[in-house]
Swiss-Prot record:
Keyword Chloroplast: no
Cross-link position per record: Glycyl lysine isopeptide (Lys-Gly) (interchain with G-Cter in SUMO2): 86
Main location as per UniProt: cytoplasm
Protein's UniProt keywords contain Heme: no
Localization annotation: Cytoplasm
One record GO biological process: muscle organ development
Domain named LIM zinc-binding: residues: 40-92, 101-153, 162-212, 221-276
Keywords: Acetylation, Cytoplasm, Developmental protein, Differentiation, Isopeptide bond, LIM domain, Metal-binding, Repeat, Ubl conjugation, Zinc, Zinc-finger
The protein's role, per its UniProt record: May have an involvement in muscle development or hypertrophy. Isoform 2 binds to RBP-J and plays a negative regulatory role in the RBP-J-mediated transcription in mammalian systems.
InterPro entries to which the protein is assigned, alphabetical: Fhl1, LIM_FHL1/2/3/5_N, Znf_LIM
Species for this entry: Rattus norvegicus
N6-acetyllysine, modified sites: 4
Name of protein: Four and a half LIM domains protein 1
Lineage, top ranks: Eukaryota, Metazoa, Chordata, Craniata, Vertebrata
Zinc finger map (C4-type): 7-31
């Protein structure tokens, strides 16, 4: 008499039927799905005996459920990467390890044009001016805190403007009486000589180099007839009755004693000491 060939679970005869042998036991397909089948970690349904199964590190999937966690590309017949419990295709795994753009927060992968500044990175087209929103890319820019400005917007928003030409001072420049100038704009009003770092004289908001001030502006000493410049020797001036003298030229017409800061007598457009004036 032949041995019974029945399902281990439901005892239905298996003769002439499809069955599965598991752990030395025979079972019909229905009981296999109910009692023996692995559960797909993706869809949570049993992986039936006639379905294709993918197995990786004690986890099981239907072959159609085994996809990249990012792009959902099927991976049953392709290489893949396991990262932090997620199954990824090679392309998405590379992106996961790539730095993120500060602008769009997307991955910057090999071959992407990018801009890096102080450890932060952007796609080239994501690196834009905080004011006009135009792409700065690899062009010149000015950082201000967390913001970045193109040259034009920085000049408009932050740069000092020259009091003469009213254009932005982007580098260098000088300050005189709390007013900013381009070095090339701060010049002698007569000869256009640059005055930065040079001696000059201001007269009614006009600026003169030493030579032009001497020749065209300075008063002439009533004694020596030379210009009174205020530079070097003779910087002290004596003024009286609309006339001016170098302090060293202000002396008695007769005895030549210097009268700067002393009593004197002015007679017939001439200067005398008191003693000589008595003898006139």
């Amino acid at each position: 008499m032949s041995e019974k060939f029945d399902c281990h679970y439901c005892r239905d005869p298996l003769q002439g039927k499809k069955y599965v042998q598991k752990d030395g036991r025979h079972c019909c397909l229905k009981c296999f799905d109910k009692f023996c089948a692995n559960t797909c970690v993706e869809c949570r349904k049993p992986i039936s005996a006639d379905a294709k199964e993918v197995h990786y590190k004690n986890r099981y999937w239907h072959d159609t459920c085994f996809r990249c966690a990012k792009c959902l590309h099927p991976l049953a017949s392709e290489t893949f990467v396991s990262k932090d419990g997620k199954i990824l295709c090679n392309k998405c795994a590379t992106r996961e390890d790539s730095p993120r753009c500060k602008g769009c927060f997307k991955a910057i992968v090999a071959g992407d044009q990018n801009v890096e500044y102080k450890g932060t990175i952007w796609h080239k087209d994501c690196f834009t001016c905080s004011n006009c929103k135009q792409v700065i890319g690899t062009g010149s820019f000015f950082p201000k805190g967390e913001d970045f400005y193109c040259v034009t917007c920085h000049e408009t928003k932050f740069a000092k403007h020259c009091v003469k030409c009213n254009k932005a001072i982007t580098s260098g420049g000088i300050t005189y009486q709390d007013q900013p100038w381009h070095a090339e704009c701060f010049v002698c009003v007569t000869c256009s000589k640059k005055l930065a770092g040079q001696r000059f004289t201001a007269v009614e908001d006009q600026y003169y180099c030493v030579d032009c001030y001497k020749n065209f502006v300075a008063k002439k000493c009533a004694g020596c007839k030379n210009p009174i410049t205020g530079f070097g020797k003779g910087s002290s001036v004596v003024a009286y009755e609309g006339q001016s003298w170098h302090d060293y030229c202000f002396h008695c017409k007769k005895c030549s004693v210097n009268l700067a800061n002393k009593r004197f007598v002015f007679h017939n457009e001439q200067v005398y000491c008191p003693d000589c004036a008595k003898k006139l």
